[in-house]
From Swiss-Prot:
GO terms for biological process: mismatch repair. SUPFAM superfamilies: ATPase domain of HSP90 chaperone/DNA topoisomerase II/histidine kinase, DNA mismatch repair protein MutL, Ribosomal protein S5 domain 2-like. GO terms for cellular component: mismatch repair complex. This is DNA mismatch repair protein MutL. Residues 114-137, 437-456 are annotated as: Disordered. PANTHER family: DNA MISMATCH REPAIR PROTEIN MLH, PMS, MUTL, DNA MISMATCH REPAIR PROTEIN MLH1. Keywords: DNA damage, DNA repair. Residues 442-456 have a biased composition (Polar residues). Belongs to the DNA mismatch repair MutL/HexB family. PROSITE patterns: DNA_MISMATCH_REPAIR_1. GO terms for molecular function: ATP binding; ATP hydrolysis activity; ATP-dependent DNA damage sensor activity; mismatched DNA binding. It comes from Neisseria meningitidis serogroup B (strain ATCC BAA-335 / MC58).
Amino acid sequence: MSRIAALPDHLVNQIAAGEVVERPANALKEIVENSIDAGATAIEVELAGGGIRLIRVSDNGGGIHPDDIELALHRHATSKIKTLNDLEHVASMGFRGEGLASIASVSRLTLTSRQNDSSHATQVKAEDGKLSSPTAAAHPVGTTIEAAELFFNTPARRKFLKSENTEYAHCATMLERLALAHPHIAFSLKRDGKQVFKLPAQSLHERIAAIVGEDFQTASLGIDSGNGALRLYGAIAKPTFAKGKTDKQYCFVNHRFVRDKVMLHAVKQAYRDVLHNALTPAFVLFLDLPPEAVDVNVHPTKTEIRFRDSQQVHQLVFHTLNKALADTRANLTESVGNAGEVLHDITGVVSTPMPSENDSENLFDSVSNYPTGNKSDTHNAFGSSGKTAPMPYQSAYAPQQRSLSLRESRAAMNTYAELYKKTDDIDLELSRFEQARFGNMPSETPAPQTDTPLSDGIPSQSELPPLGFAIAQLLGIYILAQAEDSLLLIDMHAAAERVNYEKMKRQRQENGNLQSQRLLIPVTFAASHEECAALADYAETLAGFGLELSDMGGNTLAVRAVPAMLGKADVVSLAKDVLNELAQVGSSQTIEEHENRILATMSCHGSIRAGRRLTLPEMNALLRDMENTPRSNQCNHGRPTWVKLTLKELDALFLRGQ
């Protein structure tokens, strides 16, 4: 039987390197973090062969004392901590003393460093675990570390590396994260001798724009909130900017990039009311807290952490983001161009870009190449086969509702008119607005003479509602509205769904329960065993949602009361859907966690259905509701409620001004 023996230090370092240095990007991270801890204000990175052939990092930090330069390449040698108490309060990026030793054991490493009070630099080399004697060298104040031929002595590890392009991409991403976390430091990157980027010391606002992109910066909401010793700040993207990828998600804890389940779950919860399930939010979040409140000594790469009070962190992140998103209401800052990107992320269909003034020669080619779908897409919005032209992206936008009969439509016609008694004046305001906008155009009928100047009663641009005024209804699905220099298209079902949803949430928060309305004649329906069980378990909960059901026996349930604001909904479908939602509540989930989903389901049943014809006052009342409703840019499922076509974009379609 083999005897137990101590492993040689070089082998121990190579084993440790398997945890710390998985690929060139990890080696780059360890070296750059040392530069940050050294107080550098400028860091230059050069890569060759994707970081496999060479990683060179130069900084202008404090440097290493000549007597310590050999020790810097020994395992567990560090200047960051000396006691266990120091470890619990560590604020530096590195602290274990494993990084350089691990890199030196699997590469040909050269370390050159000079302190401010030294007349020359000191250089030491390491190859295959063997250190050379320190020698004098020429070097400015600071440190340069070169790691060449990574994994040259561990071919089994090297064969697991990807292509040079892939490894470079990982290195560039790693450096961008470090640059984003430390905007006060200038960063530069060269790849195979060519400059990739050069970032000066910047403000956080400027660094976010440089790394994440100007498009993110334009579509983001700034946040800055605190709770005791915790501070959360940064930027989160509006839901309309959401993508199908997670490449624009950054979480930093004490300026260290992390992948933390607590923070990510809080972000997901904050966006769940406004984001389509096929999309992911974009954000750059910085959480500052005392070092003793977080344990970073959990994973060799330090990307996983553990909070002392994770509930406090979750609440801070969720409430901060939820409040910022709730403050977003319908306005005229979104455009149909961004909606096309959203549709591409949801459906995978590439939309045709809006032509610019210089693209007139390609306009008709773009129209002819516009996606028309297959035969199955030629069904119209009412679910039957029609002769109308197929509508691109109909599957992404079409409300998943059956069309109403004429009798049902008439019965529900006055919903919004009852809520807004003064909407009769909207038609007059609209006509005045049109006169102001197009009053100089020739008219076949002379305008009547009046002693009152026309401008006295015309709303100015500042008085116009953000979503303008409705002018027509399209295909029983969309509302066309005219605003200043733009045409708006509103999905009436999606918009009404959000309005009803927020009203029910507000009523539930203020009163604890939704007001119910008893049915004159109870409606019975055949139920499944699961639905009957859900009623037995959650009858009291249903009452809180304004639903009163009773078990008639024989798997038959009766609906006796429904929420007052949903009085005209299909009560059977409403009851069955809510029961199904409740049936999904398991032992690890509570009603509170499902509450918004239940309210969203209920609001869907009480919203305007496809095929219902609205009057202008009803359409305008819905627009005013949207302007006063939080998160009204998206429906409960995260789909856009409206898009905008500017006058310039409309002119381009007709080659005006070409």
